[in-house]
Amino acid sequence: VSGEAAEAAMAQAMEANKGKYIVVVDGSVSTLDDGVYSTNAGKTNLQTLKDVTANAAAVVSVGSCAAFGGVPQANPNPTGAVPVSDIVTDRPVVNISGCPPIPEAIAGTVAYFVTFGKLPDLDHLGRPKAFFGDSIHDRCYRRPFYDKGLFAKSFDDEGARNGWCLYEVGCKGPVTYNACATM
């Protein structure tokens, strides 16, 4: 199938399903100079995002770049990269952060929408609570060692080799909310 045929099929599907489809976006959006630094099929990705989300029910931002801007948004940000939610402000945006994001979180969010016709409950960062509602610390297999006060002092000491808690060597599990400890 040619690119033109694929683009035409996408346009037909969006027209036939106005207000019923979701758009899944990967990557931050270049905005400087009208988005000219990121293009596909002769259009800027900025314009494509605006076009495909115009009649969408919701948008799912997949990955840390799409959800929060990621590394491309870091200073000096030569392309004016922003997260999807900076562009799409007129409909719900679900953020599934991670680099890479957890595949089950993506599939679970889409399946929830298809099954129930609505988006799942979201946390204060727009992430699905089902996948981002618990801290890694709460579900970590090293948690029993934390509770007993058994901490590795370096990554190559006896405690680390025995699976002790890594909190004292920089683990951010207690303040990181994600399902990666269980998936």
Predicted features along the sequence, with ranges:
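Iron-sulfur-associated redox domains of electron-transfer enzymes in respiratory
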Residues: 1-183
